[in-house]
Amino acid sequence: MYRFTKDPAYLNLARNIAKFLLNHPNLPADKVPYWDFNAPDIPNAKRDVSAASIMASALLELSLYTSGKESKNYVSTSADILQVLSGPAYRAKPGTNGGFILEHSVGHLPGNSEIDVPLTYADYYFIEALQRYKKWAL
């Protein structure tokens, strides 16, 4: 919203959301979130690469509207997430996974739907984040 309105309240909200996510005690070291930060079975809870992809892309955009150490931290964290998602734990081997790039997303675990599967929007935000990183951070 800040990009379109330039209302500082939206920028402040985005910064607070980023702070909440990045400092959450249940965010794993590789920064690929569990399907729910309060899942009762952490650390054995399913991971959600769609959430990680969205977070990487959003942090890159947020880096454009912040400066100094804060901006660099958002870029660096996004780079770390993209590196992890590009690795063997989360990226599908070519010719597998129905043509999707990423594995291990969770859509709606309580509804027993889309659990540990590829999701279109995970790949979408992963590609968006890669493009943003290439354009804005390299």
Indicate residue ranges for each PLM-predicted region.
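Glycan-recognition and catalytic cores of secretory/periplasmic carbohydrate-active enzymes
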Residues: 1-138
